[in-house]
Amino acid sequence: MGMRMMFTVFLLVVLATTVVSFMSGRASHGRNAAASDLIALTIKGCCSVPPCTANHPELCG
């Protein structure tokens, strides 16, 4: 393989790696948002139960 071909292969590998990491980063943002929503729902559930509210006043502010 010549230098030009090796450089082309290198660029293709870098491009593919960048695209994969970009897409996986975007996918994890969705999972993080879903986890945050679940945590918020759990806290709201706790705040509606008086014993839980008494035990965790910092959550229900």
From Swiss-Prot:
Highest taxon in the source lineage: Eukaryota
Region of interest: Ser-Xaa-Pro motif, crucial for potent interaction with nAChR: 48-50
Organism: Conus amadis (Amadis cone)
Signal peptide: 1-21
Positions carrying Cysteine amide: 60
An example Gene Ontology molecular-function term: toxin activity
Cell compartments where the protein resides: Secreted
A matching Pfam family: Toxin_8
Keywords: Acetylcholine receptor inhibiting toxin, Amidation, Disulfide bond, Neurotoxin, Postsynaptic neurotoxin, Secreted, Signal, Toxin
Tissue: Expressed by the venom duct.
Name assigned to this protein: Alpha-conotoxine-like Am1.2
